[in-house]
C-alpha cells in the first residue's frame, strides 16, 4: 500500500498525460501530490521532509509550467529533486560529517562505517546521474518519450539500484546468530 501511495502522483501524471497532454497532467500531478501529503498526514500524523520537498518542487515547477505554458519547467522537476537529494547527501557527508543514509537506516541495520560511507556515496552518485539522465532524455527526445522514461525508466532504474544496494549490503550484514548479543559484547 505504501508503494502505491508513493507512486500515486506519477501514475496519475502518466495517465493524464496519455489522455489530455502535459498541462492537464501537470495540474493533476500537483493536485495528486497535495492529496498524497494530506493522506499521509491524516494516516500517520507526520510527513517526512523528503515528501515536503517533493511537494514544494512540484508546486514550484508545475506551477511555472502552467503559468508560463512551457513544459520545460516540469521536465526540470525530476532533475531538481534528484540533485537536491544528492546534494543533501553530499553536503551532509563533506561539510557536517553526517551520513544521512545511516541516519535513515541505522536503526534497522548494523553496518561498519566504511559500508555506510559507500552507501552514501553510491546514492549521491545515483541521484546526480539520474538528474543528468533526466535532462538528456528531456532535451534529446519528444515529450511522450520523456514521460515514458519518467515512469518506466526512472522507476526501473531506481528499483535496479535498490536491488544492487541490497546485494551489496547482503555481503556486510551479520546474521543474528553470528555475533554475541550487543549487551554482552565488550
UniProtKB/Swiss-Prot annotation:
InterPro entries: YciB
GO CC list: plasma membrane
Protein's UniProt keywords contain S-adenosyl-L-methionine: no
Function: Plays a role in cell envelope biogenesis, maintenance of cell envelope integrity and membrane homeostasis.
Originating species: Acidovorax ebreus (strain TPSY) (Diaphorobacter sp. (strain TPSY))
Record-stated family: Belongs to the YciB family.
Highest taxon in the source lineage: Bacteria
Keyword Cell membrane attached: yes
Subcellular location: Cell inner membrane
A Pfam cross-reference name: IspA
Protein name: Inner membrane-spanning protein YciB
Key words of the record: Cell inner membrane, Cell membrane, Membrane, Transmembrane, Transmembrane helix
